[in-house]
Amino acid sequence: MLRTLAVSALLLAPAAAVAQSPAPHVQDAWVRLPAVSGRPAGGFFLIHGTAKADALVGVTSPRAERIEMHSMVNEGGIMKMRAEQSFAVPAKGALTFAPGGNHLMIFGLSPDVKPGGTIPLTFSFQSGAKVTLNAEARAANAPVKAPEPAAHQH
């Protein structure tokens, strides 16, 4: 019996270590509401990586039908959106989602979300870590504020 418990503890220890890995830090999350009702909203944020590389594999919200992650690529001088399954979060580095670059496309956003309100977003990482925070909802014509990477404290 004691031997079985000891073996079980040894087998479960790596899983517990993975589950307790620190999550990347997400900050400056905001959502640009669509100018036309029924169109997708855009989502933007800054992620700071931990000591180990990770990957953002999805974002969800109870206030949206679905959320896609997109990159912008230059194909023959024409900028095109491309849906992505994941984005690398470098160890001790940063991943930025900003207007004109990487961004979220938020489909079926709840119509009661108004400028000045918030939208809960859950960020899922390849490591199994999840980070939930409230993103500020901004009007389609609101000025863009750049994220401040220097403001992050390790």
Question: Could you say what each language-model-derived stretch is?
Answer:
Residues L12-A16:
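N-terminal signal peptide c-region/cleavage motif recognized by signal peptidases
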Residues M1-A9:
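Bacterial N-terminal signal peptides that target proteins for export
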Residues S21-H154:
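Compact, glycine-rich, soluble single-domain proteins
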